[in-house]
Curated annotation (Swiss-Prot):
One of its GO terms (molecular function) is S-methyl-5-thioribose-1-phosphate isomerase activity. Belongs to the eIF-2B alpha/beta/delta subunits family. MtnA subfamily. This is Methylthioribose-1-phosphate isomerase. The lineage of its organism: Eukaryota, Metazoa, Ecdysozoa, Nematoda, Chromadorea. The record marks C180 as: Transition state stabilizer. It comes from Caenorhabditis elegans.
Length: 366
């Protein structure tokens, strides 16, 4: 799959680019037969890796948001299924398809998980292979989800970094704003938007990052801040409601976000609050860039109107670390995502090039 979609901007990528992995936190540990994931609900107070032994465990850690981030949950779901298939002595296609659908239901908005797991179905439904060959092909495919993510993430970060150099040729260092967590805790490599920020810092092209706390789940303050502290990246944490004032009073050059689901026309679903940032960027004439791997493109939907928005429990808004901060009887609306319309997006930065939204559909690899 990777060879079909690679489009490296201003390549080749130098070996020195983001070579120091000691500055990176690891979201999981996998040795081929054992999988452990970092329990992100315990961060920043405790770093604890918990075992994932199969599909049920993978579903649980994804559903509970012990792991989160579209690329990461795709890998965890795939490896959870791989661990079960590795133990199987014979193929049970119907059971595997049931497990695929079960895993996909854990986070319905995040398309990476769906895209990755649905890629198994043509193998299972093929009449060209014996059951023994199908089983081996399934194992190989699921392992490749893990290995491909590392390769594609490096290309994605490089391409996006090159776009920023081109967009701001007269600026030595950039001031960037971001939301949620899109770094190594959301992927198995450097990350999407935060990976680009880490690249800017490593190349001495970053002045400052404004990090939104990202209510109600606080991924900015709990996760992004510890990644940036660990990497010694200059940043300031702000509340979500401070974004407009920060844009007005400080020179924010661009906003970089991740994405969980991108329609063919470029409409982009991401963490709730992203649409707000895009509207503010339009008003303040600031570039707005989603940083998006190929696996996040949803070729099955034409516009953002078709994206199903997950709604989370009211307790996630009313409680912080288990402590009730509002009346337990408060009525709550808690969508996990919003959709930014394509016309508010400067470019969508991908591992197959950097594209204005209106050009995305014709550039999506087949």
């Amino acid at each position: 799959m990777t060879s079909k979609i690679n489009k490296i901007v201003n390549g080749p990528i130098p070996d020195s680019f983001l070579f120091d992995e000691s500055k990176r936190l690891d979201s999981l540990k996998f040795d081929g037969t054992n999988l452990e994931v970092l329990d992100q609900l315990l961060l920043p107070h405790e770093f604890k890796y918990i075992p994932v032994e199969g599909v049920s465990d993978a579903f649980a850690v994804i559903k509970s948001m012990q792991v989160r981030g579209a690329p990461l949950i795709a890998v965890v779901g795939s490896l959870g299924l791989l661990l079960e298939i590795q133990k199987a002595s014979e193929l049970d296609s119907e059971s595997i398809i049931q497990k695929i659908n079960f895993l996909i239901s854990s986070r319905p908005t995040a398309v990476d998980l769906r895209n990755s797991l649905n890629g198994l179905k043509p193998i299972l439904e093929s009449q060209d292979y014996s059951d023994v060959v199908k089983l081996e092909k399934c194992r190989s495919y699921l392992l490749n989800v893990y290995t491909d993510e590392k390769l594609q993430n490096r290309i994605l970060v490089w391409n996006a970094y090159q776009e920023l150099l081109s967009a701001f040729p007269d600026k030595e260092k950039l001031t960037v704003m971001t939301i949620c967590n899109t770094g190594s805790l959301a992927t198995i490599s450097w990350g999407t938007a935060l990976g680009v920020i880490r690249a800017l810092h490593s190349e001495n092209r970053l002045k400052l990052v404004y990090v939104l706390e990202t209510r109600p789940y606080n991924q900015g303050i709990r996760l992004t801040s510890i990644e940036l502290l660990h990497g010694e990246v200059p940043f300031k944490l702000i509340t979500d409601s401070m974004a407009a004032w920060a844009m007005k009073n400080h020179q924010v050059d661009c906003v970089l976000t991740g994405a969980d689901n991108v329609a063919r026309n470029g409409d982009t679903a991401n963490k709730i609050g992203t649409y707000m940032l895009a509207v503010l960027c339009k008003h303040h004439n600031i570039n707005f860039y989603p940083v998006v791997p190929f696996t996040t493109i949803n070729k099955n939907i034409a516009t953002g109107e078709e994206i199903k928005i997950e709604e989370r429990p009211s307790a996630e808004m009313l409680r912080v670390n288990g402590v009730l901060i509002g009346n337990s009887e408060c009525p709550v609306w808690n969508p996990a995502f919003d959709v930014t319309p394509a016309h508010l997006i400067t470019k969508i930065l991908t591992d197959f090039g950097n594209w204005p939204p209106e050009m995305l559909e014709q550039q999506i690899p087949k």
